Amino acid sequence: MSRIGKKPVAIPSGIEVKVDGNVLKFKKGNAQKELDTKNHVDVKVEDGKVEFSPKGEDRQSMAFWGTYRALAHNIVVGLTDGFSKQLEINGVGYKAAMKGKILELTLGYSHLVNYEVPDGIEISVDKNVITIKGTDKQQVGQVAAIIRDFRAPEPYKGKGVKYLEEHIIRKAGKTAKK
């Protein structure tokens, strides 16, 4: 049974929440987010809290109960604080620069790698650190993963794009015969 689903989601001041059928609508200023529960859970908004309850007693309803509660919590955190991920570029000649809405990466290929930044995401570059910010946790993580995949870190010298807190396990190189 879900323990996450039991906890109500606290709504901080400045965020409006409405239930419209199966859709939960969050609004803060001009930013709006929607969560479609697809009729898997019951939603109640009262006393500055959003409470979820399962539609049935089957396993699937219980799984959706915790999932939708976590998604709603992520929307609230995204609208209040936002989410961010940091990537680090390691390697001789490897660099990044923002040119308008395009992230331009030099990663040791014979060509530049250009990545168009999607709406709702802000990217800033400071020396060899790329900072990705946004209100949608899934989108921030997806953009970070896409940028990392352009040149994933290799295990011998550690060259490539890695998450700032990621530890790359290094391998020993070839040893000469004696």
UniProtKB/Swiss-Prot annotation:
A molecular function (GO) term: structural constituent of ribosome
The keyword tRNA processing is assigned to this record: no
Subunit field text: Part of the 50S ribosomal subunit.
Gene Ontology BP terms: cytoplasmic translation
GO CC annotations on file: cytosolic large ribosomal subunit
PANTHER family: 60S/50S RIBOSOMAL PROTEIN L6/L9, LARGE RIBOSOMAL SUBUNIT PROTEIN UL6M
InterPro entries: Ribosomal_uL6-like (IPR000702), Ribosomal_uL6-like_a/b-dom_sf (IPR036789), Ribosomal_uL6_a/b-dom (IPR020040), Ribosomal_uL6_bac-type (IPR019906), Ribosomal_uL6_CS (IPR002358)
UniProt function note: This protein binds to the 23S rRNA, and is important in its secondary structure. It is located near the subunit interface in the base of the L7/L12 stalk, and near the tRNA binding site of the peptidyltransferase center.
Protein's recorded name: Large ribosomal subunit protein uL6
Family annotation (HAMAP family): Ribosomal_uL6_B
Keywords in alphabetical order: Ribonucleoprotein, Ribosomal protein, RNA-binding, rRNA-binding
Gene giving rise to this polypeptide: rplF
Gene3D superfamilies (alphabetical): Ribosomal protein L6, alpha-beta domain (3.90.930.12)
PROSITE patterns xref list: RIBOSOMAL_L6_1 (PS00525)
Family: Belongs to the universal ribosomal protein uL6 family.
Lineage: Bacteria, Pseudomonadati, Campylobacterota, Epsilonproteobacteria, Campylobacterales
